[in-house]
A protein has these predicted regions:
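Conserved beta-strand/loop element in small beta-rich adapter and peptidoglycan-binding domains
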Residues: 204-219
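Short, surface-exposed secondary-structure edge patches
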Residues: 178-180, 201-207
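Short beta-strands and strand-coil junctions in structured, solvent-facing domains, enriched
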Residues: 198, 214, 222, 234-236
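Low-complexity segments
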Residues: 1-137
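Second-shell loop/turn segments in exported
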Residues: 69, 196, 201
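SH3-family beta-barrel domains
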Residues: 132-196, 218-220, 240-244, 248-324, ...
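SH3/SH3-like beta-barrel fold
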Residues: 224-232
Length: 332
């Protein structure tokens, strides 16, 4: 199945492979290229010594805004931790920019977008720069769980790269198999698109891009949903520690996005290896995966852009309403 994506005026197509499980059909992301086994081994294993890395995020508005939520590691023991920070940051940066742009446009560019007040940069984490020592929502334990999933994905991609060179690869891809959304070995998911979910008491709460979930059920209910634990959430979202039911299809989309971001992170690793204190890797030569290509539909850009902006406006309004209610309660 081919999908079209539209990002900052650029269209690109992506082919998704499908397979069945439990009477349902799922689509999963496949890399558009593979590296050699040596590079995957380098990306999977620890470095000989921890690496200090300057990301250059210090003056970025999104970085200050999410200071209460996210701290990059001070040093990196392995590439998996580096990729972990890369993909968390990519999610948060994209979410901040999309919401800010959408709300600014809705307000005709007047003032700060709702929910994006400058004073919020020094929020509950007490760290306006985002990289200090104050406690943040994404705890070391949550980030370790993400890093473990990154390592597992790198190992799986290495195996897939080797299998793709064998005659049986296409046959294996068509077999029925458990999707990552339900795989007992895959528990941690990062929210990629905004979702509205219902708590056990019937009230609704929101999950937004960058929130972290831990799946605690393996068998879908009658609504094709499974229970998840909110492991890390942003202001105004479902509280950390809450349990909600999330559609299996939504979890699968989260994993697809996660896998795609890991590939982007591996690409950044390949660009930066041997520079600024990062150890050199084996050859970074890539070979294309023919069946991962899809031609983009150039007519969908405006529709995707409008849908993203509408969702961003609605989410920002909900966060502002939650903040107003909280302030009203403090005045009583």
């Amino acid at each position: 199945m081919g999908r079209t994506y539209y990002d900052h005026g650029h269209y690109y197509g992506r082919a998704y492979r499908g397979y069945g499980w439990g009477g349902n059909y799922y689509y999963h992301y496949g890399p558009s290229y593979y590296y050699g086994g040596g590079f995957y081994g380098w990306a999977y294993n620890p470095w000989a010594a921890p690496v200090s890395w300057g990301w250059g995020w210090g003056g970025a508005p999104w970085y200050g805004y999410y200071g209460y939520y996210f701290n990059p590691y001070p040093v990196y023991a392995s590439p998996a931790f580096w990729v972990t920070d890369y993909l968390i940051a990519a999610n948060l940066q994209a979410a901040y920019e999309a919401r800010a742009a959408a709300v600014a446009e809705a307000n005709s560019g007047g003032g700060n977008p709702a929910g994006y007040n400058a004073g919020d940069d020094d929020s509950s984490g007490g760290n306006s720069a985002g990289g200090g020592s104050s406690a943040v929502v994404l705890t070391p334990e949550v980030k370790q769980a993400i890093a473990d999933e990154v390592k597992a994905q790198i190992a799986a991609e290495k195996d897939a790269a080797a299998a793709s060179q064998s005659a049986s690869a296409s046959a294996q891809d068509s077999d029925e198999k458990v999707p990552p959304a339900l795989d007992p070995n895959t528990r941690t998911f990062i929210v990629a698109t905004d979702l509205s979910e219902t708590l056990d008491d019937g009230t609704e709460c929101t999950l937004t891009s960058g929130d972290v979930l831990t799946r605690i059920q393996d068998t879908p209910d009658a609504n094709k949903s499974v229970k998840v634990l909110v492991s890390g959430s942003q202001k105004g979202d479902c509280q950390s520690g809450a349990q909600v039911s999330v559609a299996v299809d939504d979890l699968q989309e989260m994993h697809n996005h996660f896998a795609e971001q890991i590939d982007e992170g591996l690409g950044k690793l390949a660009e930066n290896q041997g520079k600024n204190g990062m150890p050199a890797s084996p050859a970074t030569t890539r070979r294309e995966v023919a069946d991962a290509k899809a031609e983009p539909d150039l007519t969908v850009g405006a529709d995707i852009d409008k849908a993203d902006k509408d969702a961003a406006v609605a989410e920002a309004d909900a966060q502002q309403a939650a903040a107003d209610n909280s302030q009203g309660g403090d005045d009583d």
